[in-house]
């Protein structure tokens, strides 16, 4: 079996990613990329990719730079995969990483590699007739508790209404993030207070403060201390992603677990988060960190360092399925993130959407990712 074609498909939603002062559900991603790898036997592997999709497409479609063996360093990612055996995921990951190293190593090139790696694992599962978690090494659980992942609303009443909406669906944990949070402490605290009161003491509240609001470590510490009375399970993304020493300063000063990592890439990057950053919870996004090939290494690294892993998963059911496989593979797992946005790129891409059951998501058991892409929907929203 050989790889016959590799492509990034660019999708556009008719709506715009937004948030307002109302309790209404945010629209979700405006643009999304899909990685599609087709083999000469007809097997197809898929992954979504939450990045600047046209740039990722350029990384994949770029030509081969040199015909000289061993000189791959500016090559388009497709040229590095076509004709190769898709089952050799570890070797192909490094082939893409080295072959793009002069324009890659991190950023959009690594994100494209991540999506292609997930698609290769999807092919492997379909070839062997096994779900990805079995190929990773095993399944420790059949289901994972999900938290509703959404944006901060603009006022306490809207926060209360939003929480009531999620708990009525069966969620036992809700994470609010971004939106207008972080601009004014006197405005922020009533939002967190409203969420906690609506959730009650038996459900979990998670807070994503949004690092786009630039803070010093001491400002971050003050923020965590201010919301600690509302018992957040964790506080996420307080500082710039590369501020490892600042994260250690915060993590050592507060009692609330500190989470970050959705912007991080490669196992080397997560080693920095553990050793320099000292964070409590790692949040690798499989479409950014390096795919399953790197995600498995992050899980092993976290287990050795006694850290939790809660993958970032905010796009479509494709990434949710991938994250469930990685979470099933962990010996200890607390949560999986569930993007509650109602836009078509979040909700319509697969024929068998992942459904909440009593606050949990079931780990897919079908071959590969265990979800089936609806190619009619892909064509409907495809722009490149």
What kind of region is each of these model predictions?
Residues 38-127:
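Metal- or metallocofactor-binding catalytic centers and their adjacent structured scaffolds
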Residues 108, 117-153:
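Glycine-rich, aromatic-flanked loop segments that form ligand/cofactor-binding clefts
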Residues 225, 231, 242-360:
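Shared catalytic-loop signature of beta/alpha-barrel
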